[in-house]
A protein has these predicted regions:
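Extracytoplasmic small-molecule ligand-binding "clamshell" domains
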Residues: 21-92, 101, 254
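Ligand-binding cleft/hinge of the Venus flytrap
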Residues: 40-44, 56-65, 128, 132, ...
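Short helix-initiation/N-cap motifs at beta->coil->alpha
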Residues: 53, 69-79, 123-124, 158-172, ...
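Extended ligand-binding regions for polar small-molecule ligands
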Residues: 54-62, 122, 130, 134-135, ...
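A conserved helix-loop-strand patch within extracytoplasmic ligand-binding domains
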Residues: 65, 93-95, 99, 106-154, ...
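Alpha-to-beta junction loops
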Residues: 65-66, 83-91, 135, 171-184, ...
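A ligand-binding cleft/hinge motif common to bilobed small-molecule-binding domains
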Residues: 76, 93-101, 150, 176-211
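Periplasmic-binding protein-like
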Residues: 110-118, 190-232, 254-260
């Protein structure tokens, strides 16, 4: 009887200790890229701005959390999360089965297919054979990179640290095409003066294996139970109160909300 009593006391103490150690998430460090307009970029004064920057602020307001933005190259965001340099990632990160083996995600907060962009005065046959030996620029660590490498094996897929670097080589003629997020490229390049003479080529790509069900807030698996609910509630609240639509309409002429 005495042994059982001590066992119960030990279990209660362990549970209390675990509860005490669980973060209350009043302070959250958010990993962002800062080089993916119009979702996330740095203005001339060195301040972060964009759709996801505003969205992150709105989520933090809903959660009543004090949030800090931490800028990081896209391919370094998951390592930064695992190294506890950030608590979550808000950086147009697609929810895929492959990524879910490493990290956890919130519900999707926006969605956009992948598309090719090339010169409007050039002709492209968007097929495996048709793009043989063509140079395709992609951002390193993205689903677009993996899709291009797996699908267009006869093409020359060139990876870059940022999408802006891809655009520079596309404009200079060192690349034939880029494969990227349709919304980001439309608003951040095609509609800008720098994108004059460029447009979408071929169909939209939505293969769930690569492009998932949308973009979600990335977090460590160990934090999923406490943190995912907070973000899911904030995502749902912004959809319900019109906050998401207000930001959507500020940046885009089309609806980027996830279709779920």
């Amino acid at each position: 009887m005495q042994a059982r009593r001590w066992m119960m006391l030990g279990l209660l103490a362990a549970a209390a200790a675990a509860q005490a150690q669980a973060p209350d998430w009043k302070k959250i460090r958010i990993g962002v890229e800062g080089a993916y307009p119009p979702f996330s970029e740095v203005d001339k004064d060195g301040r972060l701005k964009g759709f996801e920057i505003d969205l992150a602020a709105a989520y933090c307001a809903e959660m009543k959390a004090d949030c800090t933005l931490v800028q990081q190259d896209f391919d370094g965001l998951i390592p930064a999360l695992q190294a506890r340099k950030v608590d979550v990632i808000i950086a147009s990160m697609t929810i895929t089965d492959e990524r879910k083996r490493t990290i956890a995600f919130s519900a999707p907060y926006y969605n956009s297919p992948g598309r090719f962009i090339g010169r409007t005065d050039a002709r492209f046959d968007v097929s495996v054979a048709g793009l043989k030996d063509k140079k395709i620029g992609v951002q390193r660590g993205t689903t677009h990179e993996k899709f291009a490498l797996d699908t267009f094996k006869q093409s020359k897929v060139v990876s870059y640290a940022t999408q802006d670097q891809v655009f520079l080589d596309l404009k200079s003629g060192r690349l034939d095409l880029t494969l990227a997020d349709m919304v980001a490229v439309d608003e951040g390049f095609v509609k800008k003066p720098d994108g004059k003479g460029f447009g979408f080529v071929g169909p939209s790509f939505t293969d769930v294996k690569y492009f998932g069900v949308g973009m979600g807030v990335g977090m460590r698996k160990a934090d999923e139970k406490t943190l995912a609910k907070k973000f899911n509630d904030a995502i749902a609240a912004l959809r319900a109160n019109g906050g998401f639509k207000k930001l959507n309409d500020k940046y885009f002429v089309y609806d980027v909300s996830p279709k779920n």
